[in-house]
Amino acid sequence: MENIRESEIKHSAIRVATLLCVFALVAVAADQNVVVLLWPNGAPGSEGKTALEKVRITPDGEHVITSVYQPSITVYLPSREMATGAAVVIAPGGGHAELWVDHEGYAVAKWLSEHGVAGFVLKYRLAREAGSTYTIEGNSLPDMQRAIRLVRSRAAEWGVDPQRVGVMGFSAGGDIAARAATQFDAGDSAAADPVDRLSSKPAFQALIYPGLPPDLPVSRDEPPAFLLCGADDRAGISEGLPALFIQLKHAGVPAELHVYAGVGHGFGVRSANTGAIAGWPDQFLEWLSTIGFLKRK
């Protein structure tokens, strides 16, 4: 009897250990997010470039990405119960030479997904990285435009309303988001690739301490804008963003501007953020609600 009991105990222990392993694997899988290439067969302008992107980890544990040859989006979806149908393509900053994907990418997308908004972190090609042959207009902007189209093409799969796909950009990523909000098209109905038949116009734009291009055109055709920066940021941003707000207002584009006293550049979404700046994502969400983009359909 003792041997039988010992055997039963051993088998029970094995079953428990197996279940724990299964639960652990499920937890790991749930914590991993799908990465989707913008062009599965290779990005135009990156022919023959198959090297993997490089990842540098800072002393603070931040992940910084360089050498992006095949641009992609990392997908963060809300639960079905939370999903509002709204979606944001997020462009991290890094001076067009690198991508700070944590506090200006993954953390943002995760927060949004937990509040019912699908987040897609864009890894775009870098125009100012040492030795780069890419340009902002020729590669980085098309990466953003393709990402918008791609999200729309998989809207049903991802629980997204194709009419509520917007863009958000931080610093250099804000440059790209701002360009995407002014340079767009309805798609090419004759394109061989179904993705290219869809519109690249974002439904809204969120520019977070953006490095604005000096020649950015402003027109009444732009989508609604959420603008945000710190008062202590460099003049091109802390003065340039309010100037853009005035231009948008004169053009008849709905816009909201937030300038935070005593705040500089690069705050993003961090657990270390304190004071008023820690609540900026909530203000963005409130703005989305105000313009009617969080209403479930």
Annotate each language-model stretch with its function.
Residues 30-83:
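N-terminal cap/lid segment of alpha/beta-hydrolase-fold proteins
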Residues 84-93:
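Short beta-strand element of the alpha/beta-hydrolase
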Residues 100-101, 107, 125-159, 271-277:
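Catalytic nucleophile-loop/oxyanion-hole region of alpha/beta-hydrolase
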Residues 101-120, 245-246:
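Short amphipathic alpha-helix adjacent to the substrate-entry channel of hydrolases
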Residues 142-222:
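Primarily recognizes the serine-hydrolase "nucleophile elbow" in alpha/beta-hydrolase
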Residues 227-229:
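Short beta-strand/loop motif that positions the catalytic acidic residue
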Residues 234-242:
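Conserved alpha/beta-hydrolase "acid-adjacent" motif
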Residues 249-297:
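C-terminal catalytic histidine-bearing segment of alpha/beta-hydrolase fold enzymes
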